[in-house]
Amino acid sequence: MSRSVNPARGEASVAGIMLRPSFAALVAAEEELGPLFALVERAAAGQLKLSEMVALFWHCRFDVGADVSRDAFSDSVTASGLVAATPALKTLLGQILGGR
């Protein structure tokens, strides 16, 4: 990650990758995962799947080289563990609900 995250912009990081929940990123995530409010509801109910979390992260990745594949990114997030991914997920879900 070449830049530091900007919390005022709703950015987070996971596995050394900056996540920026731009409109385009969230639309792409919604196309794959279904309505974002339903995603937030599943997360609140403890029903969010690992694959859904990683897909949200993948669509929100920012400033990542083309050499990083989705499989490699997924493996990196998984290797970091849920404890490391939870703060980024919380930030992105808060951004979905609150916007800025």
Regions found by a protein language model. Give the residues of each.
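Residue-level signal for threonine
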Residues: 22
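A residue-level signal for conserved active-site and pocket-lining positions in enzyme catalytic cores
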Residues: 57
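Charged interaction scaffolds used for protein-protein
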Residues: 1-11, 31-51, 62-100
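Glycine-centered positions within short beta-strands or beta-hairpins
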Residues: 14-19
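A short local loop/turn or secondary-structure capping micro-motif enriched for an aromatic residue
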Residues: 26-29
